[in-house]
């Protein structure tokens, strides 16, 4: 007999994200008693194929970034349709919202409106059943804690400095548990601060908590990270590896198919881009590169995958935008070997789970990710465990909006106890073991 968890109330409001911009928060009430609350994140470097985040455009309020229209869409359009539905029917509810919107990219109601409701429904159902969210979504086999892909140095759109590439991250692949992994990252982060200070650099942080110093080149961040790993007492590559998100779509000129490294003063062809990455991978303990070429450069992606696809993880973010149509094309063409999962790129929990399942069936890894504009919401921590993804990207250990996710993962690991699994290098299950 199916439990009846009737949705009895839905309420959206405008709140602030970690950058001081408005975002949508939604509360869904089940059986007049159990509440699920979710807040929606927002990106800075967004893929052109992403679902649309609805903003008011009224320059007199929050410089046009208000979300009152999205809030109104939840309260006046979505709420009347889903009140009375069973919160356990997640797929049906998500499908109904997609149909209510009626556009390819959720531009009518806004992906921020739809996602807020989608996640709040799942949380309300989990609370009503007395289950943690990861177990409600993932079932009895949800037990894999993720390897953090921790952003500790910023350039590009996430910082005001001389580095063209956007994110330099560390991955504690040699840890034995998530709590140990987190400690290794935090220690390296603190040692990196000292390394940067010793070189005369400032140690202010960017949107995602990583340092954003005015470094001299695109390679210097790698040098200082290796030094910090060693100073923390770890072996680069064995204990802690490096991951990159250069966000090259921001450097790409579609007209001539070239990449403009403005801060470095260099222009590279797609062939030179592949060569650039191959050389860096040979020189540094890099285990993952995200968006190594631009989202529309399918030819460049093919070349990059042929050159490095067996050696390291090649993650498609702007390339796939958590979208099954884009991912299906990538799988067919044999490009990349991993997908970045951002809930707000697609706009519902159901479509997110479909993208993860499609990736896994094709032998692609999935990396669950935050956005640069975050809140205290910790849904992605539960999601990454629910789907046994094995990797999470959610910033540095230095801002509450990022640390909230790590702290939730510590709680989940503690709750799982002896059944918790920390995959380490096995998170890269599709790579040829060195």
Swiss-Prot record:
It is found in: Cytoplasm; Secreted; Cell surface. The active site is at 208 (proton donor), 342 (proton acceptor). GO terms for molecular function: magnesium ion binding; phosphopyruvate hydratase activity. One of its GO terms (biological process) is glycolytic process. InterPro entries: Enolase, Enolase-like_C_sf, Enolase-like_N, Enolase_C, Enolase_CS, Enolase_N. Keywords: Cytoplasm, Glycolysis, Lyase, Magnesium, Metal-binding, Secreted. Its cofactor is Mg(2+). Belongs to the enolase family. Catalyzes the reversible conversion of 2-phosphoglycerate (2-PG) into phosphoenolpyruvate (PEP). It is essential for the degradation of carbohydrates via glycolysis. This is Enolase. It comes from Caldicellulosiruptor bescii (strain ATCC BAA-1888 / DSM 6725 / KCTC 15123 / Z-1320). The gene is eno.
């Amino acid at each position: 007999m199916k439990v009846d968890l009737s949705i009895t109330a839905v309420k959206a409001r405008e709140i602030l994200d970690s950058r001081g911009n408005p975002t949508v928060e939604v509360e869904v009430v089940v059986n007049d008693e159990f509440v699920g609350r979710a807040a929606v994140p927002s990106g800075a470097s967004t893929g052109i194929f992403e679902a649309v985040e609805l903003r008011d455009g009224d320059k007199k309020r929050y410089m046009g970034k208000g979300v009152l229209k999205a809030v109104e869409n939840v309260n006046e359009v979505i709420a009347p349709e889903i009140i009375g539905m069973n919160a356990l029917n997640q797929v049906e509810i998500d499908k109904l919202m997609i149909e209510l919107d009626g556009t390819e990219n959720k531009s009518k109601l806004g992906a921020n409106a739809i996602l807020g409701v989608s996640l709040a429904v799942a949380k309300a159902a989990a609370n009503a059943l007395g289950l943690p969210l990861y177990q409600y979504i993932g079932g009895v086999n949800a037990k894999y804690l993720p390897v953090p892909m921790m952003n500790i140095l910023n350039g590009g759109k996430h910082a005001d400095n001389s580095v063209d590439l956007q994110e330099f991250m560390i991955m504690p692949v040699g840890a034995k548990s998530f709590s140990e992994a987190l400690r290794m990252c935090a220690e390296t982060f603190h040692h990196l601060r000292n390394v940067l200070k010793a070189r005369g650099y400032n140690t202010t942080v960017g949107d995602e908590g990583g340092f954003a110093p005015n470094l001299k080149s695109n390679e210097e961040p790698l040098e200082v990270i290796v030094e910090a790993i060693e100073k923390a007492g770890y072996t680069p590559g064995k204990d802690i590896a490096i991951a990159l998100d250069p966000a090259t779509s921001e450097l790409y000129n579609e007209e001539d198919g070239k990449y403009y490294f403005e801060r470095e003063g260099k222009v590279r062809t797609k062939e030179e881009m592949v060569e650039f990455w191959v050389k860096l991978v040979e020189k540094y303990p890099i285990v993952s590169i995200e968006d190594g070429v631009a989202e529309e450069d399918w030819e460049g992606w093919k070349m990059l995958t042929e050159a490095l696809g067996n050696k390291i993880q090649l993650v498609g973010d702007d390339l796939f935008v958590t979208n099954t149509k884009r991912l299906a094309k990538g799988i067919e063409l044999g490009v990349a070997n991993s997908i970045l999962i951002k809930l707000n790129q697609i706009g519902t929990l159901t479509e997110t789970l479909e993208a993860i399942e499609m990736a896994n069936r094709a032998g692609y890894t999935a990396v669950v990710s935050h956005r640069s504009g975050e809140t205290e919401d910790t849904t992605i921590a539960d999601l990454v465990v629910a789907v046994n993804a094995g990797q999470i990207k959610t910033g540095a250990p230095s801002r509450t909006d990022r640390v909230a996710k790590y702290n939730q993962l510590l709680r989940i690991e503690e709750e799982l106890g002896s059944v918790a699994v920390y995959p380490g290098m096995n998170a890269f299950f599709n790579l040829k073991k060195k």
